[in-house]
Swiss-Prot record:
Keywords: Hydrolase
InterPro entries recorded: Nudix_hydrolase, NUDIX_hydrolase-like_dom_sf, NUDIX_hydrolase_CS, NUDIX_hydrolase_dom, RppH
Names of the cofactor(s): a divalent metal cation
Annotated gene: rppH
Protein name: RNA pyrophosphohydrolase
Database matches in PROSITE patterns: NUDIX (PS51462), NUDIX_BOX (PS00893)
Nudix hydrolase domain: residues covered: 11-155
Enzyme Commission number(s) from the entry: 3.6.1.-
MF (Gene Ontology): bis(5'-adenosyl)-pentaphosphatase activity; guanosine-3',5'-bis(diphosphate) 3'-diphosphatase activity
CDD domains for this protein: NUDIX_Ap4A_hydrolase_plant_like (cd03671)
Organism (species): Cereibacter sphaeroides (strain ATCC 17029 / ATH 2.4.9) (Rhodobacter sphaeroides)
A Pfam family this chain is assigned to: NUDIX
């Protein structure tokens, strides 16, 4: 018998998200390596114990794209945390079943390097390929349960995006 999980009893996982833009204002989008269907997203991940959100953002950027902090310029930070809930079919199956979704702080960075410096084949590889895309295409490409988050993030950083 499968046990039913009440999402209201679970906390949100503290995370960061990174909107990485190039000189034209296009957004870095990575194709998730663990998805059987096209699932594009921006770099994101958990905040480690004792880590500040901005530190976590730069660490996640490095782990997922191979881009070091010296090759990006801080542009902005979203004023509010945003949350999303996992859909029922994923609840209890990811993150050891400990979380109902994520609570994210988003950061906007401008990439100062060249495309050939991006290295997604890192020790913590999350993406099978990547590309630069416009804001509307990024929102359309994300999995549906994260779409409201991406809409809010894009609206927040709109003045800087292509």
């Amino acid at each position: 018998m499968e046990r039913t999980i009440d999402p209201g009893t679970l906390p949100y996982r503290p995370c960061v998200g990174i909107v990485l833009i190039n000189r034209e204002g296009l957004i870095f989008a990575g194709q998730r390596i663990d998805s059987p269907v096209p699932a594009w997203q921006m770099p994101q991940g958990g905040i480690d114990e004792g880590e500040k959100p901005r530190e976590a953002a730069l660490r996640e950027l490095w782990e997922e794209t191979g881009i070091p902090a010296e090759r990006v310029e801080f542009v902005a930070k979203a004023p509010d945390w945003v949350t999303y809930d996992l859909p029922p079919e994923l609840l209890g199956r990811v993150w050891g079943g400990k979380y109902r979704g994520q609570r994210q702080k988003w950061f906007l960075y401008r990439y100062l390097g060249t495309d050939d410096e991006v290295g997604i084949g890192t020790d913590h590889a999350e993406f099978s390929c990547w590309r630069w895309i416009g804001a509307e295409e990024m929102v359309a490409a994300i999995v549906p349960f994260k779409r409201a988050v991406y809409e809010e993030v894009v609206a927040t950083f709109r003045p800087h995006l292509a």
